[in-house]
Amino acid sequence: MSNLISLTRDLIGDPSGAEQTFTDDQIERSLDVYRWDFRYFPLKPLPTVVSRNVEYRDWYSDELYWESDAALYDGSYGSLTPSSSDPIHGRWSFAAHQTAVLVSGKIYDPYGAAVDLLEMWAGKVALEYDVNADGAGLSRSQKRAALLELAAQYRKQQKIITAKQERADVW
């Protein structure tokens, strides 16, 4: 989860430290709103040619942003241990050929979480005020506008959710 929290912090421009706006727990709660659980989800192979034979050592998912605790299984549901993994990009590699790889774990939408956090942050800074004194001006309202503008940009990048609707009044 720490990689996803760091990624979300990077997206919203809130580095961890003494001056951070959000705690890791607040970011994790926002990520949990945009979480999907997968059980035995089939991965796709990337072929590798070894001595003129095709082997499947590298596997990937079309879904991105997996939590690092994702578990991998072979076609008979035996546990697998990858030689390398990149769960943020949904990629796992093995030292030996695998015929099928399934993954169980959670994916997140850091862009959706970033939008929520940016909108909360904009709500916080909306309470700040602009000051004009002796011809000099300090404008804090531009911070709110910038946060909302970034939120609107990320809203376009977040995961699309669709639902099937059935009408009971139409036969």
Task: For each feature predicted by the language model, list its residue ranges.
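Conserved short "hinge" loops at termini or chain/domain junctions
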Residues: 1-110, 116, 120, 156-171
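Amphipathic protein-protein interaction modules
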Residues: 108-145
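Long, highly charged low-complexity segments enriched in Glu/Asp and Lys/Arg with interspersed Ser/Thr
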Residues: 141-162
